[in-house]
């Protein structure tokens, strides 16, 4: 797992014991798994607020639980997260139906526009469920205001980095695969 030995899994209220049965503590895998139970769904950025103590001064990778990644690229990308100097990086993948995903427009590896499920086409680069952040992510997540859905939105968090010109793009390379089981 690309030198990653500490993993935080955030679970919905009432699901903690089910997860612990499947992945008790990670000892057999040579990792340490920490669990936090989220009382109510408050959006993806809430994971950083809940995990503040776990994150500390480290960079962090967020992998959505309903996304499946396959290929050797994953270890390489996770290593890059460890070495991320500043900012955030989003893993993108070309899709045939961008209206089903969060989508990004990119210029010279910098993300210039992000929209969630756009009605009008502007890019076919879907934002996969793999994100990399420096340790400012907790501070930025705490600054967010809930959306109309009464949740903190990942696009708002990414836009904080974009405004600082610190949001970059990366791609699933040849031989890699991504499946969003939630879409």
Regions found by a protein language model. Give the residues of each.
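Conserved N-terminal catalytic core of the sugar/cofactor nucleotidyltransferase
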Residues: 1-64, 68-76
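Short, conserved catalytic or adaptor-binding loops enriched in Gly and charged residues
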Residues: 24-30, 105-106, 160-163
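Residue-level signal for inorganic ion chemistry
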Residues: 35, 51, 66, 104, ...
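Conserved beta-strand termini and adjacent loop/short-helix elements that scaffold enzyme active sites
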Residues: 36-38, 91, 170-172
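A short acidic, often aromatic-flanked loop/helix-cap motif at beta-alpha or helix-coil junctions
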Residues: 41-44, 97-99, 120-121, 177-179
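Catalytic-core segments of class I nucleotidyltransferases/pyrophosphorylases
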Residues: 61, 75, 79-82, 110-182
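Conserved donor-nucleotide/metal-binding helix-loop-beta segment in metal-dependent transferases, i.e.
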Residues: 71-99
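Conserved hydrophobic/aromatic beta-strand scaffold that supports enzyme active sites
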Residues: 90-92, 103, 130-132
């Amino acid at each position: 797992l690309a030198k990653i030995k500490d993993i935080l899994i955030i679970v919905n209220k009432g699901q903690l014991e089910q997860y612990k049965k499947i992945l008790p503590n990670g000892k057999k895998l040579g990792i340490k798994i920490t669990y936090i139970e989220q009382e109510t769904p408050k959006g993806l950025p809430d994971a950083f607020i809940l995990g503040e103590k776990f994150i500390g001064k480290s960079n962090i990778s967020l992998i959505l639980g309903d996304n499946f990644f396959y290929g050797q690229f994953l270890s390489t990308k996770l290593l890059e997260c460890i070495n991320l100097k500043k900012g955030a990086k989003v893993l993108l993948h070309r899709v045939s139906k961008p209206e089903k995903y969060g989508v990004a427009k990119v210029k010279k590896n910098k993300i210039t526009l992000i929209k969630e499920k756009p009605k009008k086409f502007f890019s076919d680069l879907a934002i996969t469920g793999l994100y990399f952040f420096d340790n400012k992510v907790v501070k930025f997540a705490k600054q967010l205001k809930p959306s109309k859905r009464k949740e903190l939105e990942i696009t708002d968090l990414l836009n904080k980095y974009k405004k600082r010109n610190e949001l970059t793009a990366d791609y699933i390379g040849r031989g890699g695969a991504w499946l969003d089981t939630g879409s």
